Amino acid sequence: MANQLILLKKDFFTDEQQAVTVADRYPQDVFAEHTHEFCELVMVWRGNGLHVLNERPYRITRGDLFYIRAEDKHSYTSVNDLVLQNIIYCPERLKLNVNWQAMIPGFQGAQWHPHWRLGSMGMNQARQVINQLEHESNGRDPLANEMAELLFGQLVMTLKRHRYATDDLPATSRETLLDKLITALANSLECPFALDAFCQQEQCSERVLRQQFRAQTGMTINQYLRQVRICHAQYLLQHSPLMVSEISMQCGFEDSNYFSVVFTRETGMTPSQWRHLSNQSD
């Protein structure tokens, strides 16, 4: 696309030898669709927003992790106190003898699964490494680039150790209630979610959990679940032949008329209009 915004290496890296650096987004503002001359890891710390990656929408919040390739198109909209960090790197500049393809999904043709989650323990460990990496990537001493690459290797191994699929928190995990709740919500796309039953199972206060969730994500639990379902509906409308009523059921709405009302309120167009517009742009 001739008018596609492309982020350039020269605007982010200090020289042609630097392989890795950190770009803070405190907060991340609305950002138009773009690609890059480099790759990046996106780690979300707080708040929420709509991340559209290769035309697929994701409602993102704390703990979301993305592996972005240079050619991927993505944008940020509907942001609310969204705080994230981009760890950007040039694969061709990496010199460390590490099996990067085993560590980074999509690295130079490796199998690509872009969206993962980190629990609180993984986030804490990753944050420590990223802080060191940011310090070294801003350094000017002769070994700064080598130290930054070593820390990048440590980071991608830490992420691989702690990441998990969005709907599959390991049963042995020692993660927090908030991590368990977000995983439970991801498993409730098609069926009702009962917060009282969740709190009874986890032996926690419903009121306190609601407060914690809102403080960390900037949304209520119901708002988050509704928007995750709408994102899934947008994807199905664009990429499946299912009827609107069938998509409504698959996204947790038993009444297709109510689904259409909610979808229109959240996106500004009806499900049929969304499908028509998406098919036109393909």
Curated annotation (Swiss-Prot):
Residues annotated as DNA-binding are 196-217, 244-267
Q: Which Gene3D superfamilies match?
A: Homeodomain-like, Jelly Rolls
Q: Where is this site: Interaction with sigma-70?
A: 246
Question: Which top-rank group of organisms is this from?
Answer: Bacteria
Quick one: a GO biological-process term for this protein? rhamnose metabolic process
- Does the keyword DNA-binding belong to this entry? yes
Pfam families assigned: AraC_binding (PF02311), HTH_18 (PF12833)
Could you state one GO cellular component term attached to this entry?
cytoplasm
* Keywords of this entry: Activator, Cytoplasm, DNA-binding, Repeat, Rhamnose metabolism, Transcription, Transcription regulation
Q: Which GO terms describe its molecular function?
A: DNA-binding transcription factor activity; sequence-specific DNA binding
Hey, what's the signal peptide range on this chain? Answer: none
Q: Does the keyword rRNA processing apply?
A: no
Q: Where in the cell is it found?
A: Cytoplasm
- Explain the purpose of this protein: Activates expression of the rhaSR operon in response to L-rhamnose.
Query: Which HAMAP family does the UniProt entry name for this protein?
Result: HTH_type_RhaR
Protein name (database record): HTH-type transcriptional activator RhaR
Q: Which organism is it from?
A: Salmonella heidelberg (strain SL476)
High-level lineage: Bacteria, Pseudomonadati, Pseudomonadota, Gammaproteobacteria, Enterobacterales
